[in-house]
């Protein structure tokens, strides 16, 4: 790591010669494999942007020239080159480096949300601010790729960027061959129009030999132009779209040829106006296990053996795999069930449904808003759509859920993976807002399974509902030990435990456990009986609307405690409190929930412990309440 060790700021890159730059790129790839193998993280995307990121920091003057990485999971090389290489052993660990750009870490990091398709809007606003300040010298650079251009927000931003003819905005499209689906949206239509033009055949015939002589970039470009009609993924962007927007276009550029990268970026740096630079890169570049992973190119990994790329520990069946299996069973029985993903078929468990029912599966790209309204259209046509997305990405589609699905009472089922605390991916990946958001949609019904069996049951129940939207939410991670109910009330509420104290006149506590929080609720219940209280633990299963039996049970107890993994305002505790007020039930109630703040990255167990949401923390809190309410 001789050259890498000499790099502490971007300025150190500017004096390197060609030989040094090639060596540095190799050192960075070795460094990435070694470090990410030990912590887990986004390996493939970062291996693909080594030369590109070196070029960005050689040509532009960060942070005076802001460099914004869309999604920012591909910002590891940027972190390395801006003085943070020494901290990579702590990547995605508590109190360590974030897996995304982070304003608290460095002045070179301008943003930190890991939601896609936002970088161009940030760049548009930053460039306007510079213009208002009279700064006509510095550029604003936005690096966008990995499918982000399938998000509508990018095109809204491009429309505005293009209108600023004298604003120096550099849009770097990192095209790694995995980003664009020709069967979706205007890309395919645009090239189809190009193909119909008289010059197209002449161009392709004359260009075939010269393109293929350009090496892998030329071959991929030629093949991609023909691939659209066949529905194959392509690396080429319909380049005539950008001049029509009023933007200069440069490319395609070999994103692994440092000299070519630098030259293209220098041209963009000197250009007085908005410009697109199209870089063709290879995700997973230089690491054989990633290059051989044809499905994902090691987009994201856990802890792995750096030599083989194999996981250090075997993964256990999780919530997503149970959902995946059950949805296929349901799909086999009901041909009206269809599935929708926003560019995440594998991570959300829909790949198996796609394999079994390809005509009933729809990948809409990174477009959650469109996904939900398209689902409403499918429902209007007599289908029952299941939209599987990460909970955090529901935030973008809330208006569509509220107005396009909810107001029309359409039977759309949203399956929210990674609900609650997600941990190491940090603040913007936590799914702690979904209960507060969905609960305000009139007519929506929300379910929170506690284990594998209840997930299967609730998914079937949700899809059987045909008079309005349903939501099934479950967390990240391994499945808990199954919990068998000892009783089920009329409206489906499961009673999980009755824990009696030794005293005959002991106060009674009702614990309402939401979803997989049932496991910790049972542990807490067994502990607090030692403090002289009787405890009943229930799992509502359907948490929105509040089951009426919870109101009756609350009236029969001396204290009601809700335990959930969403934010404290607007969650089940708030909803139950409202229901008790409406029924004039004055039983004291308390909430155990996620605080109303953005959570730092750490493991799920560390986050729960930090905020008093593990068994020890909850016990301490509850005992304090008991002493306050019932102590002598």
UniProtKB/Swiss-Prot annotation:
Thiamine diphosphate binds at residues 73, 114-116, 147-148, 176, 287, 368. Signal peptide: none annotated. The keyword Metal-binding applies. Its cofactor is Mg(2+); thiamine diphosphate. It catalyses: D-glyceraldehyde 3-phosphate + pyruvate + H(+) = 1-deoxy-D-xylulose 5-phosphate + CO2. It comes from the Bacteria. InterPro entries: Dxylulose-5-P_synthase, THDP-binding, Transketo_C/PFOR_II, Transketolase-like_Pyr-bd, Transketolase_BS, Transketolase_C, Transketolase_CS. Pathway: Metabolic intermediate biosynthesis; 1-deoxy-D-xylulose 5-phosphate biosynthesis; 1-deoxy-D-xylulose 5-phosphate from D-glyceraldehyde 3-phosphate and pyruvate: step 1/1. Mg(2+) binds at residues 146, 176. The keyword Transferase applies. GO terms for biological process: 1-deoxy-D-xylulose 5-phosphate biosynthetic process; isopentenyl diphosphate biosynthetic process, methylerythritol 4-phosphate pathway; terpenoid biosynthetic process; thiamine biosynthetic process. Binds 1 Mg(2+) ion per subunit. Keywords: Isoprene biosynthesis, Magnesium, Metal-binding, Thiamine biosynthesis, Thiamine pyrophosphate, Transferase. One of its GO terms (cellular component) is cytosol. Belongs to the transketolase family. DXPS subfamily. PANTHER family: 1-D-DEOXYXYLULOSE 5-PHOSPHATE SYNTHASE-RELATED, 1-DEOXY-D-XYLULOSE-5-PHOSPHATE SYNTHASE, CHLOROPLASTIC. Homodimer. This is 1-deoxy-D-xylulose-5-phosphate synthase. It comes from Corynebacterium glutamicum (strain R). The gene is dxs.
């Amino acid at each position: 790591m001789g050259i890498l060790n000499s790099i502490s700021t971007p300025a150190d890159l500017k004096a390197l010669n060609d030989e040094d730059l090639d060596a540095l790129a190799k050192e960075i790839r070795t460094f990435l494999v070694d470090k990410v193998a030990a912590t887990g993280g986004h390996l493939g995307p970062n291996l693909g942007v080594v030369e590109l990121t070196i070029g960005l920091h050689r040509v532009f003057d960060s942070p005076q020239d802001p460099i914004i990485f869309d999604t920012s999971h591909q910002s590891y090389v940027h972190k390395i080159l801006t003085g943070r290489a020494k901290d990579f052993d702590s990547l995605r660990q508590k109190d360590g480096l974030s897996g995304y750009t982070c304003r608290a870490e460095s002045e070179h990091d301008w943003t930190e949300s890991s939601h896609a398709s936002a970088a161009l809007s940030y760049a548009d606003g930053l460039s306007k601010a510079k213009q208002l300040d009279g700064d006509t010298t510095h550029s604003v650079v936005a690096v966008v790729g990995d499918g982000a251009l399938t998000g509508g927000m990018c095109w809204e931003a491009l429309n505005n960027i293009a209108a600023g003819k004298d604003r120096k905005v550099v849009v770097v499209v990192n095209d790694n061959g995995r980003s664009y689906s020709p069967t979706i949206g205007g890309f395919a239509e645009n090239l189809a129009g190009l193909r119909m033009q008289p010059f197209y055949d002449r161009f392709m015939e004359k260009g075939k030999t010269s393109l293929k002589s350009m090496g892998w970039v030329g071959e991929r470009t030629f093949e991609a132009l023909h691939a659209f009609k066949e529905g194959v993924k392509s690396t080429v962007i319909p380049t005539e779209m950008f001049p029509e927007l009023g933007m200069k276009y440069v490319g395609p550029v070999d994103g692994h040829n440092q000299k070519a990268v630098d030259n293209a970026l220098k041209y963009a740096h000197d250009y007085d106006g908005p410009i697109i630079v199209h870089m063709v890169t290879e995700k997973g570049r230089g690491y054989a296990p990633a290059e051989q992973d044809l499905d994902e190119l090691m987009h994201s990994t856990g802890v792995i053996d750096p030599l083989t790329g194999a996981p250090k520990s075997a993964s256990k069946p999780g919530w997503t795999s149970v959902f995946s299996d059950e949805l296929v069973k349901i799909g086999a029985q009901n041909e009206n069930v269809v599935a929708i993903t926003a560019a995440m078929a594998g991570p959300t468990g829909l790949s198996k449904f796609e394999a079994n029912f390809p005509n009933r599966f729809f990948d809409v790209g990174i477009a959650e808003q469109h996904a939900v309204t398209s689902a409403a259209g499918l429902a209007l046509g007599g289908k029952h759509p299941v939209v599987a997305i990460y909970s955090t990405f529901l935030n973008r589609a809330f208006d569509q859920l509220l107005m396009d699905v909810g107001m029309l009472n359409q039977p759309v089922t949203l399956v929210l993976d990674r609900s609650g605390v997600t941990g190491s991916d940090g603040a913007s990946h936590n799914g702690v807002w979904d209960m507060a958001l969905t609960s305000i949609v009139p007519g929506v019904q929300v379910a929170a399974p506690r284990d594998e069996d209840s997930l299967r049951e609730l998914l079937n129940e949700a899809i059987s509902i045909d008079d309005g939207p349903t939501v099934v939410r479950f967390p990240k991670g391994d499945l808990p030990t199954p919990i068998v109910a000892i009783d089920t009330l009329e409206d489906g509420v499961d009673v999980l435990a009755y824990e009696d104290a030794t005293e005959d006149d002991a106060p009674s506590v009702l614990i309402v456990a939401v979803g997989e929080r049932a496991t910790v609720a049972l542990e807490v219940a067994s502990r607090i009986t030692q403090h002289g209280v009787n405890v009943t633990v229930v799992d509502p299963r359907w948490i929105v609307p509040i089951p009426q039996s919870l109101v009756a049970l609350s009236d029969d107890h001396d204290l009601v405690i809700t335990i959930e993994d969403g934010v404290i305002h607007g969650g089940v505790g708030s909803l139950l409190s409202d229901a008790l007020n409406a029924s004039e039930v004055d039983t004291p109630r308390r909430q155990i929930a996620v605080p109303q703040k953005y959570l730092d990255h750490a493991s799920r167990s560390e986050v729960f412990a930090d905020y008093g949401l593990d068994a020890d923390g909850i016990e301490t809190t509850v005992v304090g309440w008991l002493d306050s309410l019932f102590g002598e």
